[in-house]
């Protein structure tokens, strides 16, 4: 039986843990400001308001859907695939009207919701400049209500991949990998922007309007990532036998360290490969390399040490220019904000490298094969589910001619055509003869990723 002092101490521990979870949750929420700036900087000036509107509505619609439907779907799917058994009624009412004893129910939901909205908003960058808003928002409803919750159900919520031993600490594959694959699939179905590719299949670069915004967005995202990774250590204190010990905080320093080193190595990897290929250090490659390094670390940050973080971050950054060029020149898919090489392939890479750098392999003698098999199966299941679901939704809209805006609206710009606003009104209207504005929104097409060209 707990004494009064012990009971008070237990309450203090729970309170500290809840404050920690809420703090990192708010930090992760602020990552949406980073996504908004990163994507706005990489689109043309005539499409900035459209991109910002999609970011705002992704959160606003998605978080309501995740509350009303998505969280319950996760619990139901988990119960159907080997996780904790639950009824449909309990899955919904456990969130709508939790028991008095379930003091953390809504905090736990909010923590899960910011992860869900991160997965949802990744897609918007891939389809920028031509996606019809109603198609995109319908997909937002379904990714928040069904697609992402199914992935969570078979993994974090206790489903069959969790039972198999699949390891994803903070969403390298569950959040970022699936978001990147969904974005690539959507961009493939919608098709490229006008004049993105020539008749012979060669690519034209349509430069974004503000590297400044893109870099600012990168740094905001990197800051929020500390909430994403470090915050997943969700119970800093533990109470047992009348005493308080460090819970997840026993390893939180290592998570913070490998997160920091991973992002830095990612920037160097992407910048180095870009320099090797073009003779120039592309600013956007460096910025996106920071994010690719972070994505690569996210699935395994709890179970690796600093040498592994440097290698994984470097590889995640280095693959970015290579994969982007493959998507652009071989697949001829117009992934505007490079969401697949930043989130998709980097997330897959980091998740699959877990058995190579995992602490249990080197310190506990675990078998690499025993750790590798669940990772391969998990990546495959998540990738196939995401591809099939995304194809069905955007393919359906394409079949009825509602997946992308009209050619006139795309040419005019979605800010004025779809929203009735001009993001930069002080620059005036495009010149009737050249189509070039003072803000550069009609700038002739260049070469390379965004700014550079390989030497002849």
UniProtKB/Swiss-Prot annotation:
Which Pfam families does the record cross-reference, listed alphabetically? Ammonium_transp (PF00909)
> Which keywords does UniProt give here?
Ammonia transport, Cell membrane, Membrane, Transmembrane, Transmembrane helix, Transport
Q: Name one GO molecular function term.
A: ammonium channel activity
What is the recorded membrane topology of this protein?
Multi-pass membrane protein
Q: Name one GO cellular component term.
A: plasma membrane
Please state where this protein is localized: Cell membrane
GO BP, one annotated term: ammonium homeostasis
| Induction info | Expressed during ammonium starvation under nitrate-rich conditions.
Membrane spanning stretches: 18-38, 61-81, 109-129, 141-161, 170-190, 211-231, 255-275, 281-301, 304-324, 339-359, 377-397
Cell cycle recorded as keyword: no
Write down the InterPro entries for this protein, in alphabetical order.
Ammonium/urea_transptr, Ammonium_transpt_CS, NH4_transpt_AmtB-like_dom
Residues the UniProt record annotates as site (Twin-His motif. Important for optimum substrate conductance)? 176, 343
Keyword Transmembrane among UniProt keywords: yes
This protein's major location comes to membrane
Q: Which residues form the signal peptide?
A: none
Q: What does this protein's UniProt record list under function?
A: Involved in the uptake of ammonium/ammonia (NH(4)(+)/NH(3)). Transport is electrogenic.
The family note in this entry says: Belongs to the ammonia transporter channel (TC 1.A.11.2) family.
Subunit info? Answer: Homotrimer. Interacts with both GlnK1 and GlnK2 after ammonium shock.
State the protein's name: Ammonium transporter Amt2
Native species of this protein?
Haloferax mediterranei (strain ATCC 33500 / DSM 1411 / JCM 8866 / NBRC 14739 / NCIMB 2177 / R-4)
């Amino acid at each position: 039986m707990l004494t009064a002092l012990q009971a008070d101490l237990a309450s203090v521990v729970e309170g500290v843990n809840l404050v920690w979870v809420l703090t990192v949750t708010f930090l992760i929420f602020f990552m949406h400001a980073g996504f908004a700036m990163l994507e706005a900087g990489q689109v043309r000036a005539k499409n900035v308001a459209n991109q910002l509107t999609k970011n705002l509505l992704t959160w606003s619609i998605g978080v309501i859907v995740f509350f009303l439907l998505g969280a319950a779907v996760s619990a139901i799917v988990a119960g159907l695939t080997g996780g904790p058994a639950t009824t449909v009624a309990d899955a919904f009412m456990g969130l709508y009207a939790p028991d008095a004893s379930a003091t953390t129910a809504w905090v736990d939901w909010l923590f899960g919701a910011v992860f869900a909205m991160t997965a949802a908003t990744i897609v918007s960058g891939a389809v920028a400049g031509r996606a019809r808003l109603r198609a995109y928002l319908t997909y937002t409803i379904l990714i928040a209500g069904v697609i992402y919750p199914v992935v969570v159900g078979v993994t974090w919520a206790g489903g069959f991949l969790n039972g198999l031993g699949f390891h994803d600490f903070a969403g390298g594959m569950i959040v970022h990998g699936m978001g990147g694959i969904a974005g690539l699939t959507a961009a493939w179905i919608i098709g490229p922007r006008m004049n993105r590719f020539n008749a012979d299949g060669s690519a034209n670069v349509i430069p974004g309007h503000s590297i400044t915004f893109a870099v600012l967005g990168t740094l905001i995202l990197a800051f929020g990532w500390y909430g994403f990774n470090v915050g997943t250590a969700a119970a800093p204190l533990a109470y047992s036998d009348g005493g308080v010990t460090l819970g997840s905080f026993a390893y939180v320093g290592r998570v913070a360290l490998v997160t920091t080193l991973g992002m830095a190595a990612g920037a160097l990897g992407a910048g180095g490969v870009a320099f090797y290929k073009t003779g120039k250090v592309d600013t956007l490659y460096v910025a996106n390399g920071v994010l690719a390094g972070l994505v690569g670390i996210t699935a395994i940050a709890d179970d690796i040490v600093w040498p592994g973080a440097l290698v994984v971050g470097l590889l995640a950054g280095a693959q970015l220019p290579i994969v982007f060029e493959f998507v652009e020149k071989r697949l001829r898919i117009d992934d505007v904000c490079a969401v697949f090489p930043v989130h998709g392939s980097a997330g897959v890479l980091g998740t699959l490298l877990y058995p190579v750098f995992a602490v249990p392999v080197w310190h506990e003698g675990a078998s690499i094969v025993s750790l590798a098999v669940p990772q391969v199966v998990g990546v495959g299941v998540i990738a196939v589910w995401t591809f099939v679901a995304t194809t069905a939704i955007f393919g359906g809209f394409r079949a009825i001619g509602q997946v992308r805006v009209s050619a006139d609206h795309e040419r005019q710009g979605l800010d004025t055509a779809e929203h009735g606003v001009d993001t930069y009104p002080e620059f005036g209207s495009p010149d009737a003869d050249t189509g070039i504005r003072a803000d550069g929104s009609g700038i002739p097409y260049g070469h390379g990723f965004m700014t550079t060209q390989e030497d002849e």
